[in-house]
Amino acid sequence: MAAEPKAATAEVVKMDLFEDDDEFEEFEINEDWLEKEEVKEVSQQWEDDWDDDDVNDDFSRQLRKELENGTDKK
């Protein structure tokens, strides 16, 4: 009789592991998503001024100096 309560507690633990599955929505396997949703193509992938960085700012000068020092040590 001692084995029966242990089996019941083991089953309760297994059920607790799978209770979080209720948070996910289930979908049909054969659903065709492309027909239901419009696919929009984005023609512009980046900003027009993406290359307007100042290469002579403090950070760029410090980085260039560190790179030069690193190559001198080798």
Swiss-Prot record:
InterPro entries associated with the record: DSS1_SEM1
Q: Where is the composition biased (Basic and acidic residues)?
A: 58-74
Please provide the record's keywords in A-Z order. Answer: Proteasome
* Gene Ontology biological process: mRNA export from nucleus; proteasome assembly
User: One Pfam family name from the record?
Assistant: DSS1_SEM1
Annotated region described as Disordered, given as residue ranges: 35-74
Q: Compositionally biased, Acidic residues: which spans?
A: 46-57
Q: Name one GO cellular component term.
A: proteasome regulatory particle, lid subcomplex
Query: Source organism's superkingdom?
Result: Eukaryota
Family label? Belongs to the DSS1/SEM1 family.
Q: What does this protein do?
A: Subunit of the 26S proteasome which plays a role in ubiquitin-dependent proteolysis.
What do we know about how this protein assembles, alone or with others? Part of the 26S proteasome. Interacts with BRCA2A and BRCA2B. Interacts with UCH1 and UCH2. Can form a tripartite complex with both RAD51 and BRCA2B or both DMC1 and BRCA2B.
**Protein name as annotated:** Protein DELETION OF SUV3 SUPPRESSOR 1(I)
Which species does the entry assign this protein to? Arabidopsis thaliana
- The encoding gene is DSS1(I)
